[in-house]
Amino acid sequence: YSLSYFLFHFLAMPSSDFDIRILSSDLKFVPVETRMPLKFGTEVLTSVSCARVSLCVRDRNGNESVGWGETPLSVQWVWPSVVPYGERLDALLDFCAKLSGEWSDNGACGHALEIGHSLLFERLPRVLDSYNREERAGLEPIPWLAALVCASPYDLALHDAYGIANNLPTYQCYGEEHCNVDLSAFLEPSEDADVDFSGKHAADILVLNR
């Protein structure tokens, strides 16, 4: 997808006073030693690098907020392979760093669900394809699961920032009041399913334990 298509997607979307726009992102890697070995297939995990992301956003009033997200890059789980562990880890660290620029330079304004969905399912596949073609030419490509995990701390930080920007717990931000579109914009039921996502929002599915 081109940048013009990406921007058109959001320019044509309804908006609200709760919308945010990503300004910048910052990525750090945190080494973690596990308390006990974890086995994934034929490989054993005793340490992991966690990707920690901070995301700065701006609301429609010009106020800025920062959200945080973190996830372990469990190489053995997201990319099972005979390729040496070090090579796979280095590729994931590099790909994570590449995503920082992609998440910062998108121009989208909206709800975290809307921005995140387009980044994950429109931009991420293109970035992954380009990376595998240019950086992994002749080598085993980074799989889709690994790419999603690399993107997940950015998505977590985006949702965290949205809640902070609107002075609400994140899980209270998924109702009709805050979302510009319903779940039918993201989900399509199978042909034999008696399900309609029109008029439904994530808040209708999530159950908060108070």
Where are these regions (language model features)?
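Short, Gly/Pro- and small/polar-rich lid/capping loops
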Residues: 14-54
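Metal- or metallocofactor-binding catalytic centers and their adjacent structured scaffolds
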Residues: 65-165, 172, 176-177
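Metal-dependent enolase-superfamily TIM-barrel catalytic cores that perform enediolate-based chemistry
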Residues: 188-210
